Amino acid sequence: MSRVAKAPVSIPAGVEVKLDGQLLTVKGKNGELSHTIHNSVEVKQDNNQLTFSPRVGIANADAQSGTARALVNAMVIGVNEGFTKKLQLVGVGYRAQMKGNVLVLSLGFSHPIDHVLPAGVTAECPSQTEIVLKSADKQLIGQVAADIRAYRRPEPYKGKGVRYADEVVRMKEAKKK
């Protein structure tokens, strides 16, 4: 059995978990998330805990049980506390602002970039060079942050671009004559 799957997922107060066959739905103060669990994983709900165990005789059941446990744990944390991702814009003239559900980015191109945020993700700009994303869905917020970063990844000579707040950009030296 997977080391990750051995630990049960505890369900905090205010979070409701509904198991319908292989479809698991988690509802909390930040919204509702659902996930279809792989057929090789058996899920049991006891009081305020979910346990995951691999079905016998299926090749990758151990790995799938660990994956299912990690995904469900992220769902429980997301609907209870939520996730945040912070992005920084480094560079002369690089700016971000919110217009309704659209994030408008000025990243040194000849035109501004309009990035429409998907449902379930909210953004705010505390300053012109900072973006704070919030969501209950860990996978979705990570994908949105990666999409925004992909418009202008940090370059290794001056460090200009869009970076995660905790990202360390490895700098290169300029070519010497």
Curated annotation (Swiss-Prot):
Q: Which GO terms describe its biological process?
A: cytoplasmic translation
InterPro entries (alphabetical): Ribosomal_uL6-like, Ribosomal_uL6-like_a/b-dom_sf, Ribosomal_uL6_a/b-dom, Ribosomal_uL6_bac-type, Ribosomal_uL6_CS
Q: Does the keyword Magnesium apply?
A: no
Annotated coiled-coil positions are: none
UniProt-listed Gene3D superfamilies: Ribosomal protein L6, alpha-beta domain (3.90.930.12)
Q: Single GO cellular component annotation?
A: cytosolic large ribosomal subunit
- Keywords carried by this UniProt record: Ribonucleoprotein, Ribosomal protein, RNA-binding, rRNA-binding
Pfam families associated with the record: Ribosomal_L6
Could you tell me one molecular function GO term of this UniProt entry?
structural constituent of ribosome
The record's listing under PANTHER family reads: 60S/50S RIBOSOMAL PROTEIN L6/L9, LARGE RIBOSOMAL SUBUNIT PROTEIN UL6M
The record's subunit annotation is: Part of the 50S ribosomal subunit.
Q: Which family, according to the similarity comment? A: Belongs to the universal ribosomal protein uL6 family.
Q: What does this protein do?
A: This protein binds to the 23S rRNA, and is important in its secondary structure. It is located near the subunit interface in the base of the L7/L12 stalk, and near the tRNA binding site of the peptidyltransferase center.
Annotated protein name in UniProt:
Large ribosomal subunit protein uL6
Protein's organism: Histophilus somni (strain 2336)
Task: Recall the taxonomic lineage recorded for the source organism.
Answer: Bacteria, Pseudomonadati, Pseudomonadota, Gammaproteobacteria, Pasteurellales
